[in-house]
Amino acid sequence: MEKINLVWLKRDLRLTDHAPLQAALTSGRPTLLLYLFEPMLLGDAHYSERHWRFVWQSLQAINRDLAQSKGEVLIVTSDWQTCFARIAERYAIEAIYSHQEVGLACTFQRDLALAQWCQQHDIVWHEFPYAAVIRGAQTRKNWDEHWQQVMRSPCCDPDLTRANWLKLDAATLGLRSDIPATWQSKQAGMQTGGSDMAWATLEDFFARRGREYYRSISSPSLARHACSRMSPYLAWGNISLREMYQTLLKHWSVAGFRRSLIALSSRLHWHCHFIQKFESECEMEFRCVNRAYDSLLQQSSDAPAAQLAAWQTGHTGIPLVDACMRCLIQTGYLNFRMRAMLVSVLTHHMNVDWRAGVTYLAQLFLDFEPGIHYPQFQMQAGVTGTNTIRIYNPTKQAQEHDSEGQFIHKWVPELAQVPVPLLFEPWLMTPLEAQMYQVPLESPYLKPVMDLEASAKQARDRLWQWQKLPAVQAEAMRILARHVRQAKPRTSPRQPNKRQPEMD
């Protein structure tokens, strides 16, 4: 049988800075590019149609770029066992090339099974690191230096002109390749996948949008324009983190951009930091990273189904909370501060275990990245024992970051006639005012699902009491030893600690 290479695309849907593809093409053997829509992931609670639409769009962009070199990605709906076995019936798979995936437990178990299958079939599986993430790292010793070295190294750009492509179709293998029609049509308000869209978005940021980045990052309205908007393209690998970082460095001296680029550079570093954290302790998909909190969370309430549904659909009666959730449902995007607020409302004000909302928000975030999602969710829920407890006040957030009410008015049309500042606390309206501003007396905005002031006090008392417990503090020391680099001696006693930035 003819010997071939197989390049398995997963969350690296691009043709540039792609070490697995570069290595496969260098070997000279016929190379098959493969993407699997795995039933295991299609049915996983973290994913929804918006993710697979974005993946489909990304694959179509790759195939457009491959047309000139007469290549094509084989796109199949199948589990890996069936697909690889069908290919192995026709060809001798000499080697499989892919990026390491810092993913959910189900993908890790899949990879363990694949490694065993490769060993049984005498197939070499070449896995390449994701960005600067170190597989199995137990400490952060020299991690920052490693990050800089990786990010400043030359990109691994495959020479597609010399590619020896192997083209197969799913029918030949007796496999499915049908794609739902809903994946093939764009959804209004949702970003479109593909490397071409990634680069266009990045270039637009450096050309004009990015000047206001550092001052607009907290506003749910302004952030939609001024933030990089690169998160889904990084999450699905339409562009590599290194490509984005090196492009940022090229613009470092552009007038008017320095403060924004310093802020963005910091966030690219934190991007890898959180994924490394998940890689080093992936059990946090199921338990609190600070294990002492698991028994404490048994005291959390099971929110009434109606209350949880109100949070999920954006009908809590808290204007900014509802506006944010409805925006997220419609567009797949929300700036970091508002995401944190949604988690705080669920876990603090409603006193619900973070696990009750973690997969739901994953379904909504177009940029869902397991390695960022779980550490961030737990940090905002206040169950790490190492981070500052942040209990968000939605009214205060609205007053500060939507001061004219534009965002709320757009996403909560029920309050279109309500003026500022009453818009931020509509439950203070008198019946006469409600009638004047066309708010029905049965509206949740006159009687929200929670009392923000009372619930915040209860959460504050609860969380601070927990954080002082010896078991929580002991776990916190373990977490710091594993996930945080040792601080260098301060040159001045007044030098401040680094604060974690907002991540958008």
UniProtKB/Swiss-Prot annotation:
Residues 483-504 are annotated as: Disordered. It holds the Pfam family FAD_binding_7. InterPro entries: Crypto/Photolyase_FAD-like_sf (IPR036134), Crypto/Photolyase_N_sf (IPR036155), Cryptochr/Photolyase_FAD-bd (IPR005101), Cryptochrome/DNA_photolyase_1 (IPR002081), DNA_photolyase_1_CS_C (IPR018394), DNA_photolyase_N (IPR006050), Rossmann-like_a/b/a_fold (IPR014729). GO terms for molecular function: deoxyribodipyrimidine photo-lyase activity; DNA binding; FAD binding. Its cofactor is FAD; (6R)-5,10-methylene-5,6,7,8-tetrahydrofolate. Belongs to the DNA photolyase class-1 family. Gene3D superfamilies: 1.25.40.80, DNA Cyclobutane Dipyrimidine Photolyase, subunit A, domain 3 (1.10.579.10), HUPs (3.40.50.620). This is Cryptochrome-like protein cry2. GO terms for biological process: nucleobase-containing compound metabolic process; response to light stimulus; response to stress. Keywords: Chromophore, FAD, Flavoprotein. PROSITE patterns: DNA_PHOTOLYASES_1_1, PHR_CRY_ALPHA_BETA. PANTHER family: CRYPTOCHROME, CRYPTOCHROME CIRCADIAN CLOCK 5 ISOFORM X1. Binds 1 FAD per subunit. Has no photolyase activity. Residues 3-133 form the Photolyase/cryptochrome alpha/beta domain.
